[in-house]
Amino acid sequence: MQLCYQNTQITKLVNNWHTQGKTVAFVPTMGGLHQGHLSLIDIAKQKADKVIVSIFVNPAQFSKNEDLDSYPRTINADLTALKVNVDGVFIPNIKQIYPKGISKYIDVGKIGQILCGRTRPHFFNGVAQVVEILFGIVRPDVAVFGQKDYQQLLVIKQMVKNLSLNICIESGEIIREKSGLAMSTRNQYLSKNEAKIATNLHKTLSYFKHEILQNKKVYVLNELAKLDLKQHFKIDYLEVLDANNLKQITDNTHQIVILSAVFLGSVRLIDNIIFKKG
């Protein structure tokens, strides 16, 4: 495993692999690695000859009142987890990514203005900005993202299409704790009791899916699910949308996604369930 701290180092490494006819898969992360990240690396290993992981806590996707300063930074544990799994790790500092400061704007379109984009209007611009920069530095053939951040996944796919980037975007399913809680770096913020309460998010979404498949009215189910969630959380959103484009479902919708973001105390949790209509 090769460690690269400079843009020139990682670019040279990947160029050498490409010269040898090797394909390269890329898994961008902010560190705080868990089994969910490792599952994406497993997919990357299946899709390419070489795998690069980046660790960079991106300030552009945090607003002033969010957890940039307290976001878990566990670089030693992360490198231990990666040692036998990847070929290279890119650990840039902020000057490598934003040499002229954070100023570039990427229009992510309507898909970035709904759901998380409504209450975190800065977020997807920041994500798209850093991902485009990382793609330009690493120049992978394949990049792998998790479905837990489903809206982010679609935003990145749209960005790649808009910019005509020759990168195949792959996705990995949500990895869950035995309790059903979706694995997330921010789960470290939860107390033991809060972690138990947090499992109710997935339980509610699972029941919502079950009832949709019984052909019950979605708008009625949505209100009932919100009542259920309000017993445990402060709701940011709960919506049922077309999984292909995050538009409202119709009779012609084949794949559905139920998405939700909630607050448990100060911790923001997101989750989703994707399924075929039946």
Swiss-Prot record:
Residue positions binding beta-alanine: 61
UniProt catalytic activity: (R)-pantoate + beta-alanine + ATP = (R)-pantothenate + AMP + diphosphate + H(+)
Entry similarity comment: Belongs to the pantothenate synthetase family.
Additional detail: The reaction proceeds by a bi uni uni bi ping pong mechanism.
Ligand binding (ATP): 30-37, 146-149, 175, 183-186
Record-given protein name: Pantothenate synthetase
SUPFAM superfamilies the UniProt entry points to: Nucleotidylyl transferase
A Pfam family per the record: Pantoate_ligase
Pathway terms, separated by semicolons: Cofactor biosynthesis; (R)-pantothenate biosynthesis; (R)-pantothenate from (R)-pantoate and beta-alanine: step 1/1
Species in which this protein is naturally found: Ruthia magnifica subsp. Calyptogena magnifica
Function: Catalyzes the condensation of pantoate with beta-alanine in an ATP-dependent reaction via a pantoyl-adenylate intermediate.
Keywords: ATP-binding, Cytoplasm, Ligase, Nucleotide-binding, Pantothenate biosynthesis
Subunit field text: Homodimer.
Active site: 37
Annotated residues for binding of (R)-pantoate: 61, 152
UniProt GO molecular function: ATP binding; pantoate-beta-alanine ligase activity
One Gene Ontology cellular component: cytosol
Record bears the keyword Cytoplasm: yes
E.C. code: 6.3.2.1
Domain of life: Bacteria
Cross-referenced InterPro entries: Cyt_trans-like, Pantoate_ligase, Pantoate_ligase_C, Rossmann-like_a/b/a_fold
Subcellular location as annotated: Cytoplasm
Gene Ontology terms describing biological process: pantothenate biosynthetic process
